[in-house]
């Protein structure tokens, strides 16, 4: 059986499959459930400075098994209350990564300091939510903004900092480079693609917020391209996320350059048992293809262009 | 995945509950719920209180702004429906005790009808604050169920909580299954009353919901998600769930006392 354990962003993971932020993750029992089902680690819901109810429903639209559109609006219990949920997950033995969102570098730093005291092994900065005014992409849409936020946080905490960047700009690799300059230990890519659904009978957007973010198998090729381009630009590890539903998807991301992976929408489609299945199937696939360790496959597709890169 | 349907009928059931009827062809099992979308307002999880082929209905209790506005929907107005979601009640048992408080009858009445149609006997312990609030009392009687009533103010039936009626019935008569829906304190008492009587208790649970798909975690209840693991829970699955009867979660995910 191929070795699935990886070291990414200074963190040892028992396998590369992390629960993506925003899926489950509001309650400690759910985080523990994903861990117990075999996730290599769990990333919390993005936590802010104060409790936030999120948008009214509808907050979600689904498309069979190829996609899921959401604009939850960053609901979260706030940093005062959330540590008790992390504690529940940690008591279950989970490797927990704390996701935070804020409106400016100073707030990010304050929040990061508090999240870092909860026992999380690393932070993931949400610089990429496509549908929350004043947060996410709005504070992480340019390389300059990404660098400022990441630098403010890395100066304030000692644990590894992961920057989750948006695919909704022309140059995701530029954002990743900026995160690296700011001191990030890794970048995760991608967050959801900005998207919308319209109800033709009612002549209105389906989601209460109008715009949302698309996830699921539909976005896998886009996520892969982002990881591919980022891997060629940065030297820090890349965490691949976007539409991973089976072991082949996972290995495509790894070969494009991802050292760890996040899984979200597939948890919605298959339940949390997806983690055990992905780990087992990836190990078999690596065996079949002659890799002793998943780390040996990271980025191997690069340098194999049939046409020279431009 | 959503259907937009026109409401075909609006029925005032009690002073605090209103039923909206509509046609929605998806097959539903008794105990399942749908997401009811009020365009421009919000979307709510609602048990199907009527499910007879394509003819469906939901019964809404006024508890907040959106539910109040949902009650004012008129015949001809359009709403969005998605679902049905969740698990369902097994209507095979022969002797069923239904314990319903407040608007709990809405979740259990279609299952009781199904059980009666299959030849089962149904006894209903029905509770409300006062007589006019007894939801579906006549409907239960019309399906051939025996109905035992309790009201907080004594305006009909036993004065006090419906759990007193349920305890008496469980102590004196044999049942093959107990279905309960209503305030969680009530359901907890029903579970206690059935302990040691080797009769399984099934609770229909309610939590704040957003996605209804097992993604967003809004309806987390211990290790479960009410939207996909419920809404029906056998009592033993709730035994170690600390939040049951004590806490729910608000829209931000904060645990708040019930």
Residue ranges and their predicted role:
Chain B
Residues 1-77:
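Ferredoxin-reductase
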Residues 9, 50, 149-151, 203, ...:
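Structural signal for conserved beta-strand scaffold positions within catalytic alpha/beta enzyme cores
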Residues 40-42, 83-88, 246:
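Short, charged beta-turn/beta-strand-edge "cap" motif at the junction between a beta-strand
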Residues 65-210:
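FNR/FR-type flavoprotein reductase catalytic core
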Residues 107, 184-186, 205-233:
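Local cysteine-cluster metal-coordination motifs and their immediate loop/turn environment
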Residues 222-229, 233-258:
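Short Fe-S-cluster ligation motifs
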